[in-house]
Regions:
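Conserved acidic donor-binding segment of nucleotide-sugar-dependent glycosyltransferases
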Residues: 309-310, 314-321, 330-335
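Acidic anion/phosphate-binding donor-loop and adjacent secondary structure
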Residues: 127, 155, 172-187, 263
């Protein structure tokens, strides 16, 4: 089967949708499907080391949902997309965030075959969907298969575009993230518990809450350290804040390679995801769980879909540094609980392995192809 995966977001900048598309493509190729990835990039001539990647347009930053998305907006998109579709004759085109302007909308308008859309996002509201509904509905109804990565994502998109959505979660490569990865020696110290954060340095990811909680925790005990992985517009401010407050044993690693990241997870004793909202799912939670690391995460809908409090970790109210400090203190003090939660996380992560997830996606592809064929037959008859 010839499949085209369409992403609206710049592949230079790491994010959940881009990672989802990369791993989906890998698993589809492993099953002998022919895969093309269509996405913008701010680097000309860079295939990002991905077979079948086609750069379509240069991205521009657009702010939304407490973050900055980089999407392609160009008058040349129509010509380039039409040429690709005519040349390749895909069996299925799979759009990730299909109603985002740029590459998805353009491709959806032009493709005459089976179209599948995955909706990843959730937020309190989306003014673009609200005011653009009369126009966007025309494109939405061109989709023959509808996927959401979680129940919160389904509830969010259904407010604007009701439909028969299938929930197929994000996946995890459990051969890549696993407890027996070699640790990074520099992140381990005898008698110290390593607390880990992985994410973009932006306000909604909640690192400020974690830094406050960690400062409180250090006043209670000296046997902890904090490791922060990721980059973004607020990194400098966070680093300066730690220096100014004199908070000890905080290490900012910045962006790390995909080869090193699994080893960093395996080096941690506790993983923290303090996001304040705007999360439909927690891919980083799965990465930590598959690595055998107990999770402390915000009690928000997207995260509670992944972690059961008391089983794979603890769920804590967002934006509450005192509650976070208490939760961290509890786990640091209880090595047996950490081990039990880590083992439970490994078991649960197996159900999110890409091999399982892609079975569900291929089922949607088959149904979408049947619907598209029936529509074409009805139109020609």
């Amino acid at each position: 089967m010839k499949v085209c995966l369409v992403s609206p977001y710049d592949f230079v900048h790491p994010g959940g949708v881009a990672e989802h598309v990369r791993h989906l493509a890998e698993e589809l190729r492993r099953r002998d499907h022919e895969v093309t990835i269509l996405a913008p990039s701010s680097r000309v001539g860079d295939d990002h080391g991905i077979p079948g990647y086609v750069r379509i347009g240069r991205s521009v930053p657009v702010r939304g949902n407490g973050s900055v998305a980089r999407i392609a907006l160009s008058f040349h998109l129509v010509r380039r997309v039409r040429s690709l579709l005519d040349r390749e004759a895909f069996d299925v085109v799979h759009y990730h965030e299909p109603l985002v302007p740029g590459v998805p909308i353009t491709t959806l308008r032009l493709h005459r075959g089976a179209n599948v859309g995955t909706f990843h996002a959730m937020a309190r509201r989306n003014l673009g969907y609200y005011y653009g509904r009369p126009v966007l509905a025309r494109y939405f109804h061109r989709l023959h298969g509808l996927i959401c990565v979680s129940e919160p994502a389904r509830e969010f998109i259904s407010r604007y575009f009701p439909g028969d959505y299938r929930i197929v979660p994000n996946g995890i490569d459990t051969t890549r993230f696993r407890p027996d990865r070699p640790v990074v020696a520099e992140l381990r110290s005898a008698g110290m518990a390593t607390i880990l954060f992985v994410g973009r340095m932006e306000q909604r990811k909640g690192l400020a809450t974690l830094l406050d909680a960690y400062a409180r925790l250090r006043r209670l005990r000296a046997d902890v350290r904090l490791v922060v992985v990721g980059d973004g517009p607020m990194r400098w401010a966070y680093e300066r804040r730690c220096e100014a407050d004199g908070v000890p044993d905080v290490t900012f690693l910045g962006h790390v390679s995909g080869q090193v990241l699994p080893r960093i997870y395996a080096s941690a004793d506790i993983f923290c995801a303090p996001a304040s909202g705007g999360e439909s799912f927690g891919i980083v939670l799965l990465e930590a769980m598959a690595s055998g690391v107990p999770v402390v995460a915000s009690a928000i809908p997207g995260f509670s879909q992944v972690v059961a409090s008391g089983s794979e970790g603890l769920l804590v109210p967002p934006r509450d540094p005192q509650a976070w400090a208490r939760a961290l203190d509890t786990l640091v003090a209880d090595r047996a609980a950490r081990r039990r939660m880590g083992e439970a996380g490994v078991r649960k992560a197996q159900g999110f392995d890409w091999r399982v997830v892609v079975d569900g996606i291929l089922g949607v592809y088959a149904e979408a192809r049947e619907r598209a064929f029936a529509q074409l037959a009805g139109a020609s008859g």
